[in-house]
Design a protein with these regions (language model features):
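His/Glu-based metal-binding/catalytic segments typifying zinc-dependent metallopeptidases
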Residues: 43-45, 52-54, 165, 169-173, ...
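Generic recognition of flexible, low-complexity loop/linker segments
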Residues: 97, 213-217, 276-279, 322, ...
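M16 family metallopeptidases and their MPP-like homologs
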Residues: 48-58, 84-132, 139-150, 177-202, ...
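Non-catalytic terminal extensions that flank enzyme cores
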Residues: 1-50, 266
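Extended, regular secondary-structure scaffolds
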Residues: 214, 226, 235-254, 377, ...
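Non-catalytic, conformational "gating/processing" segments within enzyme and secreted inhibitor domains
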Residues: 161, 213-245, 703, 724-759, ...
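Active-site His/Glu-centered metal-binding helix of metallohydrolases
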Residues: 65, 69-73, 580
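Hydrophobic, small-residue-rich alpha-helical packing segments that form membrane-like cores
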Residues: 150-224, 228-246, 250-278, 283-285, ...
Length: 973
């Protein structure tokens, strides 16, 4: 299309056209003259289309109003007056992404879809939601999504509840999440960044309906919006839709959403704060020490790229000198770093975990001395080049897993566009990359360290210490505050709250009118592709080993996976497999120090790692096939270097350095402890699944069992180190053996021969010894564990294995997941219960579970699970609703996959003996699912719930109150 700059198209003035060679796209920058909206269209042939509308939202308090408005806009609007159009879209659209996100200074509403009609429908619902939300006239929406007083009768105590209120109680229970917020708030104390945009639970109840509406009125106007379009679409039709349906209804106004720049500090500050741990939890060596710096502005792209490189070189690489200096000084168990350039004034953080407050002076000295030494003597050239290569590989690969590329580009480009900079500058990286490479030659990196780290007074040291009294004090303060509030109320006031609570619950339980539901656009079953995508796979035999070939265009990159059979490893050595996973490739070898090895890996590859993975055979609940997996990604031309490095690691790794092994073990323990509160739901699900099948029991050696193992390993280090030497000497030759080796290669067809010629020498020198398979008697055991942490919310899981109960897997169970997650569990656990989320899974191996996330309840949630069968027996919806559930289910299984994920899916299916015919059968069953099929699953769910297998992680009060449902209760940290 031949468009001209300065011309008007559908009410939009075209200000600039540019080509972005890095992502093979054309960029069109528009301005809507009547409303003042800014629009950027990134045109290319990607069928995974993305739309978003972003508002610059700058909070002025800690009430979380930006976050609560983000939730609430999607709770009904002018054209779509159902209670939750968002949920209806998730149930029944072919979206590849659908969400909304609150950042410290912006709120983003992105959607993505490969279906053109679906894409337009999603845009329509989202635009109506942000500009005409029912939250402005329906106070129950703030009550549900934000907060409300809750009381059932006059004599009951007053309480707070609300989705965001409980979400943030969970978010701020995690020490790393709390640390991140404290760093930001204290580095920019005179700007909008001093406030918690997500909301502080202490302040959330200060938010009134008037403040809520005022925030929306102030910021949710086209003149304060940034509209983004990406992919293969009809530009004129889309612009016309935006103009006629929405933007032309608004007149341009002046909106003050500017972000003040923090005046630099005249001297570095020292800040002390505390975070909660569970009563009775050990607090020794659990302090965080951090040095935090303000770095330029995000508009200075070259500096932003340079600090991405510096973070890797100084703190992330195994060869990072600052990281290693801090570890060797014995200042803590792990070093963490962060460079956040998603705000106007980016921040760079150096963090030691597992420390003590009295080590802060030594911490400061080690950081300063090490950085001075680096400036004086220069950054090691190989380390710097390796770090630049690591960043460049990621930029060129642009593999964002299951997230649409267009979405990640959108988030990245806001780092300039939101602050009135060039809208596309973060998509053009070639020139900046050249500049950064030149800086490496000129000593500019050392100058950046001097200017922004050593001489920078706009910085602070933040000490975050554990305190077991925090939760008790917070709970007492809250109880006292609510008791005083209730005491100050008249009987009429209390009765009004009871009535308001009842009115809210009635609204939450009410069913949307059929005519309102029908206003939300819905595709037809005919719009869905009937055939599932075929697995891309072919078998070869190379050097007496099986090779799986996945011919996929990878743009010159090879994704390599080598799966070594470890079914020969004895039960008593399984812990050492997971220990080896943590250590191998991170220690010295015969020809490399561990630092030199890290540099070589980063210089020649896009990354490599080892991991234990367990597979099962389709339809066999007692099968388990453990593998020790090597994964790497590399430019095809660099394959020989990758294979040389892999050979060095396999045959010449040394595990004899006590210092290095202890450092790695401490990092491993620290990582696990951080993940417990960050991903509590994953921990309870992993533990629960281990009750049911041998495969999950095997995997559990890498979960909580491994945490216990690594703690003991460190507590009795000298003795355990010697045991490790013996175990590694035994298992290494048994692992790296080509008997039953399976290699998976994902690469373009034309590059396959190059890859094989590079890998063949390794396959030829691998030993070919046959070891007997170990038959390990994994007993099925329901442990029913309760785990206590400092969390103020719970993660509640319950499940069973339905195949063991005599049932079979069917595709209808995938539809049941959609119904449960976005109907029954959504209503009862999120909407009525106040939890942030709930989820459900029915797996082909027979394992099923229900789970809740950041949940204020425990026993009540288990009761909801137990009543599922009753809900299913009475399940009765319209044909239109049933179609919606089927479409939403297909959307979930048809997510676009990157080349790496396509190869991984095909090789995993091969191992499990899952055929295209089986996958097609599942799709056929999904498309044919009826209400009768759903009702027929009630007995299966009932039988699973009667197994009464549960696992919960949560706060001490809730877990102890429910102790009768557990066999064991443990303080986990």
């Amino acid at each position: 299309m031949n468009l001209q700059e300065k011309n008007i198209y559908c009410g939009f003035r075209l200000d600039k056209i540019s080509h972005i060679s890095e992502i093979s796209s054309n960029a069109y920058e528009f301005y809507h003259e009547k409303s003042g909206a800014k629009l950027l269209f990134i045109e290319n042939n990607d069928d995974n289309k993305v739309f978003s509308i972003t508002f610059r939202t700058t909070p002025t308090d800690d009430t979380g109003v930006a976050h609560i408005v983000e939730h609430s806009t999607l709770c009904g609007s002018r054209k779509f007056p159902t209670k939750e159009p968002f949920v209806e879209l998730v149930k029944g659209s072919l979206n590849t992404f659908l969400n909304a996100m609150t950042f410290p200074d912006k709120t983003m509403y992105p959607i993505a879809s490969r279906n053109e009609k679906d894409f337009r429908n999603l845009m329509d619902v989202y635009l109506d939601a942000v500009f005409y939300p029912n939250m402005r006239t329906t106070p129950e929406i703030l009550m549900q999504e934000g907060w409300h007083y809750e009381i059932d009768n006059v004599d009951a105590p007053l309480a707070y509840s609300g989705v965001v209120y409980n979400e943030m109680k969970g978010a701020l229970s995690s020490p790393d999440g709390l640390l991140e917020r404290k760093i930001l708030n204290n580095l920019y104390p005179d700007t909008t960044y001093q406030y918690e945009s997500g909301g502080d639970p202490v302040a959330i109840p200060d938010l009134t309906q008037e403040m809520f509406i005022d925030f929306h009125s102030r910021y949710y106007h086209p003149a304060n919006s940034y509209i983004y379009l990406y992919g293969d679409m009809d530009m004129m039709s889309t612009l016309s839709f935006l103009d006629e349906e929405y933007l032309s209804n608004f007149n341009k106004i002046e909106i003050d959403s500017h972000i003040d720049v923090q005046k630099p500090f005249t001297a570095r500050k020292l800040i002390k704060d505390i975070y909660p741990i569970a009563p009775g939890e050990a607090k020794e060596n659990k302090t965080f020490l951090s040095m935090n710096y303000s770095i330029a502005t995000s508009l200075e792209k070259e500096k932003m790229l340079a600090f991405t490189v510096l973070e890797h070189a100084l703190l992330k690489s195994e060869a990072a000198p600052l990281r290693n200096a801090l570890i060797k000084a014995g200042l803590g168990s792990d070093v963490i770093s962060s460079f956040d350039n998603g705000i106007l004034q980016p921040m760079f953080s150096i963090i030691v975990n597992g420390s003590e407050a009295n080590k802060v002076d030594e911490f400061t000295k080690v950081v300063t001395d090490t950085l001075n030494d680096i400036v004086k003597n220069g950054i090691d050239d190989e380390l710097l080049q390796a770090s630049i290569n690591s960043m460049e590989f990621k930029l060129r690969e642009a593999d964002f897993g299951q997230y649409p590329k267009g979405l990640i580009y959108n988030i990245n480009l806001m780092n300039s566009w939101l602050y009135d900079g060039d809208a596309t500058v973060y998509l053009h990286y070639e020139e900046a990359l050249k500049t950064v490479k030149q800086w490496a030659k000129e000593g500019k990196f050392e100058a950046l360290i001097q200017e922004y780290l050593l001489d920078n007074t706009h910085s602070h040291i933040l000490i975050l210490e554990p305190d077991e009294n925090v939760i008790t004090k917070q709970e007492k303060d809250l109880a006292d505050k609510l008791a005083q509030k209730k005491a100050s109320m008249s009987k009429e006031d209390i009765e009004k709250i009871i009535a308001d609570t009842q009115k809210l619950k009635e609204r939450q339980r009410s069913v949307d009118k059929p005519e309102d539901l029908e206003k939300i656009p819905l595709l037809k079953i005919e719009d869905i592709t009937k055939q599932c995508d075929k697995l891309i796979i072919a078998e070869d035999e190379i050097a007496d080993t099986k090779v799986l070939r996945h011919d996929i265009d990878t743009n010159g990159i090879c994704y390599l996976r080598m799966l070594f059979d470890i079914s020969n490893i004895a039960y008593e050595d399984i812990n050492y497999l997971f220990l080896l996973e943590e250590f191998i490739g991170r220690t010295a070898t015969k020809n490399y120090t561990y630092e030199a090895l890290a540099n070589a890996v980063n210089l020649h590859t896009g990354g490599m790692r080892f991991a234990v993975a367990t597979y099962d055979k389709e339809g066999d609940v007692d099968s388990y096939m453990p593998k020790f997996v090597f994964k790497a990604k590399v430019l095809v031309d660099k394959m020989p270097e990758l294979i040389k490095l892999l050979q060095e690691i396999i045959f010449n790794s040394s595990f004899t350095s006590k210092e290095r092994i202890k450092d790695l073990a401490m990092q491993c323990r620290s990582d696990f402890e951080m993940s417990i509160l960050r991903s509590g739901h994953q921990l309870v699900l992993d533990e629960l699944m281990a009750y049911f099948t041998p495969k999950e029991r095997y995997d559990n050696f890498g979960d909580l069992k491994f945490y216990a193992f690594i703690k003991n390993f460190l507590n009795d280090f000298d003795n355990e180190f010697n045991k490790m030497q013996t175990a590694f000497a035994k298992i290494l030759p048994m692992i790296f053996n080509k008997a039953n080796l399976l290699t998976s290669i994902t690469v373009s067809k034309n590059d396959y021969k190059k890859v094989i010629s590079a890998i063949k020498p390794l396959l030829e020198v691998l030993p070919n010894e046959t070891y007997p398979k170990q038959e390990i008697p994994f007993a099925v055991e329901k442990k029913n564990e309760g785990f206590i942490t400092s969390s103020q919310v719970q993660y509640v899981a319950k499940g069973a294995n339905f195949i063991r109960l005599g049932y079979k897997y069917t595709g209808a169970m995938k539809v049941l997941e959609t119904i449960m997650r976005y109907e029954y569990l959504w209503t009862n656990i999120r909407v009525l219960g106040g939890a942030y989320g709930a989820f459900v899974k029915f797996r082909r191996d027979g394992n099923m579970y229900f789970g809740s996330y950041r949940d204020p309840n425990l026993v009540e949630t288990l009761n909801v699970y137990d009543k599922t069968a009753e809900f299913l027996r009475n399940f009765n919806v319209s044909d239109r609703e049933m179609t919606k559930y089927i479409i939403g289910t297909i959307s979930n299984i048809d997510m676009p996959l990157t080349p790496a994920l396509k190869g991984e899916l095909a090789s995993s299916a091969y191992i499990a003996e899952m055929t295209d015919e089986m996958r097609q059968q599942q799709r056929d069953e999904i498309l044919a699912t009826t209400q009768e099929d759903i009702r027929a699953l009630a007995d299966l769910v009932d039988a699973c719930m009667k197994e009464n297998a549960i696992c919960v992680l949560g706060g001490s009060n809730k877990v102890n109150e429910a102790k009768d449902v557990f066999k064991t209760v443990t303080i986990i940290l």
